[in-house]
């Protein structure tokens, strides 16, 4: 009783100030960049409080707090309480319409905000205080002493909005006394005190954040606020801030490793049901509390400390600062006995006052003096809606809800609010929103809708028929309708309230009372089978894909090639989906590149295998071909082996046993042996490796190409009796020592068509080679011209040997692997012989359509081989629990060109490579995790493993013969499919597997386990071959069964798109409310982007390109309005990934994360009429005209309608996403969009450019030039001033002409001459011969297809260092400057003389000057399209360099 009296007599800020008086020097708030002691917090909050009072604030006036987590937020919170007002936290990232409605309900006195979100705040309300602005009136005011505002425990302290069942959120009003009572009781229980360092992790709109801040301060602890970047990686944030006390949801705690956070001593978990396994994980490592409480009970009211003896998560514990009662769910006037389930009621001083502006809902949720009240001082109770029971000891167990409220990541949501918003669109007739607790849709918000056009079925069938009716009622939801519904919800609700799945039903079942039968719908969702789930998933995918489809259709000629390669009917081709999602694979991608050449189209394999739609793929392809590198073949001259050939001889040694591949064909037209010889002669002439010879010199195997065609292959004509049979047509043994590598056999039978067999030694062919051979064979049989030859295999081997010398061993395999564990399979210590004649096979088949649905249904970018390997590891971990998972080698086609001019699309040879991947057993148990780990590993390996394989067998030669000859433990080879060989227009039919392998029984095998996966018809065939003598054979056969089960039970694969996995790991924890399906890709920003972002974070004006433009109609007619320009600009934004990119601070090592969004919501501001003479003036903007969300893109456009009918606009874009070329592209596209010209799709992936550029720079490590500071009395450590000055020096036409003449006469470029001039200036002013300065180098010379039309920051910040001593002649010095700067060109592969800017894009302390040369012509200042004219009025481009020299010659540079 005494404690309650104390609580009631104190306000929150009073308790905090008491701490400030007793411990003024102790830390109160600590962030990544600010620390406040209790004394400092008290003084700052008092100043701000007094300023609010001076503005006329009054008791319980509403003050909206809208800012990011920071120290200023804590100061603002305390100051509002000291002023006697009530603070109301709002999230600036919520939809504008929702915020506007909340502001209307709150009627705030003022909004306190920060610089970061002030624009959003000002768009919502007039009275705004930017609390962290410098200077600020409240900061400069002296601190006054005197009586504080008269506030007592019954005054309102804060208001938190929660989801409401009527479609409108509810504002819960909490008083000072209520929160103080709760905070003191709970803090004492958990041990909060001086020395506690509490993590502030929850969003401010959740009441847990109030607890993290105010309860901590009441008990004398320190509030630890991580930065945005630190919130991505919670474990480092906890360690960096030395957090020892945290309040988290079970979902957040699940991803933490107790060993990774040794400082954490107390952990409170609440907001969701606490899983038993999470209790076991944490209870022995920390003091673990299970916390329960609605917002209406001042954050929390029931708690229990968990231990190994108390692991049940639904047992929430005993009341803390409150009393609990269980009543009849239908009659709160009736108590129920202990152990009986009923509705949980909370009573006591901690209860909320009620709901803001809603007496009706307050009266229904809070009851006064029910008949069963006694002398326990609690006469007012809150009806929680939770079903629970209390045992005889007073412990509470939660058992569910009596209404339709759900919790998502700790956030309480009434599904009726979502349903009300959907029905308000008038686009549907009825709807139900559910959150299934189990089944394939577990914990996913699902919307089931019926439209006005649907015909109702039986509304309340008998219970046994419910499932059948629901399943029969499911149909596809129209993509456009789904988009409109989705957008309507985004306009009014938080992202956590947006359904993740949409299902359409012709009618919703009802109960006999006429209400929707939620119980049966929920039961049906939780028991949904795979077939229904797949149809629902695919309908979601199809509608989305269709919505994102471009208007560029595939031409019939292109469609024919696609259908031929993919083996599908044109009606089944999905142009809006990617090549992979249409059933393609890497080998089929090579075939598309090869056949594309024949019709004049050039593809890059990486583009074909990207996530781009087929429409975009063909629309952005180019009719251009790079000249093949000249490297003449020399017939008869021995040449080295390819890496895979060397691997073969390492394993088989000198036995050179037969190891062949073959194909059997049925000819449609008869052919004589003489005609066949002429056909094979053409093939062998076109493909020299089909006549190759192998021999050994000094224990080294070499190969050569005989010049003569005649006799270079063997051909036989056989006459068979009866029909063809397998034994008769068994391929012959080919000896490397005496036989040709190609054997041709023509079979004539008594009846039926001829059959042709082609048998080749594996040393000269691979699966891609067989595609080429058979395609050329079909042309030769029809007497058609064969395609032109590319680079020969001999030339490729010679170039590759040189290439291997340039590879860095540390970079070819950047992932950890483990050694093979072949000994696990040996039944005895002695190694057994691994021969082809001693093998057995375990097989299974899987439906190809179902497999594709696992990929397509996820909207992910997972490739088939990644799902195959990931599912293998999951199956292996289940079956072989007694050992670590093995390293698996994945075969690849090996035809990655490492430089322009390597054209081997039409070359026959053995190019195969293999690269190792390992998924640890602890990561393999879950299919999603296993596949993600596979992708992370696979995509980290450069060039699809080509560099690793090349280095391993050409450079890093293993001297130990035993290790060289040891087989690999596991090899997986996905052979793809040979659909183009089943076409009716071919002169033959394929009668066998193409490239089927055969070997002598005594031939050594290359691996212990060979997993061959192929597609035949509509089936995916898995064949696991292994020695018949191995141990654990029963488990191996069981592995096939489990592997198939893993795939079948996968349902629809992971929802999240597969992006660059490591950045995604960082991104996951930041955007709880953002579906990763809304994200296109994530990657680490480039060095130049990091430099710009770091600089602009210190000074927002840096690297913000501002262009002020005037758009007018040449006919004199006025433009209708600014909305036309706005719509055109949105089209431009949608067309470029760079403009849909946002940047999020990462850790200090990796810099910023670049996140590319699937959709864009550009910021478009419109102003009133403006005089034509002034485009630089300011205008008061009357509000956002865009669908602005939480995503702030790095650009905005401000539109003015001029009095003369023209449009004036200011375009502000961060330099992180554009360069000078990009600006020209954007303005030209803006004009195109205005006149409805189709925009050429920008298909760029900026991270690919970064990877290519980094690979080149890796050849030369960063150097450290000596400091070169201008003038010498300035220190580079000084930050650049905020005042920028510009001095323009214009050269006369005569001077410009003279410079051009000098350049022409002496063979130097204009840029080199300008670099020379600045070199001389620096040398003069620094009195030094060793000169360094930064300069901007263009990256558009990179050999990236289409880079000339891409928008992005295709530049790099380099440092040029040159010694001017010893250069008496200026021309010599100019040539040296030119040589040094030209060496930085990104397209060159030699060592780079200009060193890359170290320190993550910064050059502080080294140089303080930069030269940037732009080629600015008249066309970039004045543009015309039809009747429109676009003029540049002014341009700003401030850089964070003290001396920045920009040269803009109108001549080629």
UniProtKB/Swiss-Prot annotation:
Its EC number is 5.1.-.-. Pathway: Secondary metabolite biosynthesis. Residues 37-433 are annotated as: Adenylation. The modification O-(pantetheine 4'-phosphoryl)serine is found at residue 586. Residues 639-1053 are annotated as: Epimerization (E) domain. InterPro entries: AA_adenyl_dom (IPR010071), AMP-bd_C_sf (IPR045851), AMP-binding_CS (IPR020845), AMP-dep_synth/lig_dom (IPR000873), ANL_N_sf (IPR042099), CAT-like_dom_sf (IPR023213), Condensatn (IPR001242). One of its GO terms (molecular function) is isomerase activity. NRPS-like tryptophan epimerase; part of the fragmented gene cluster that mediates the biosynthesis of fusarochromene, a tryptophan-derived metabolite closely related to a group of mycotoxins including fusarochromanone. Within the pathway, fscC catalyzes the first step via epimerization of L-tryptophan to provide the intermediate D-tryptophan. D-tryptophan is subsequently hydroxylated by the tryptophan 6-hydroxylase fscE to yield 6-hydroxytryptophan. This is NRPS-like tryptophan epimerase fscC. The gene is fscC.
